[in-house]
C-alpha cells in the first residue's frame, strides 16, 4: 500500500509540474523559482483522496491570487496514464484529487 501511495504522489507531482511548465510556456506564469509544495492524504475524505497546497505556497512568488493559480493549473492538467481522473479546487486554493 505504501508503494501505491508513493507512486500516486509522484504522479500528482509530475502532473502539477507539467501544468506549471505549460502555464509558463503560455505566458500565464512568470518563470520564477517556486517554493516546495506538499501533496498529502487529507483527513477529511470529502477533500479528495489527495490534496496539494501548490497554489497557496506559490502565490507570493507568482504575485497572483491562489485561486487564480489553481484555476490556471487545473486547465492544464493531463491525467493520462495516472491513477487520477480530475482535480477540484477547494477553499483558498487547495487542489483536491
Across the structure, where does each feature detected by a protein language model lie?
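N-terminal alpha-helical targeting/anchoring segments
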Residues: 1-96
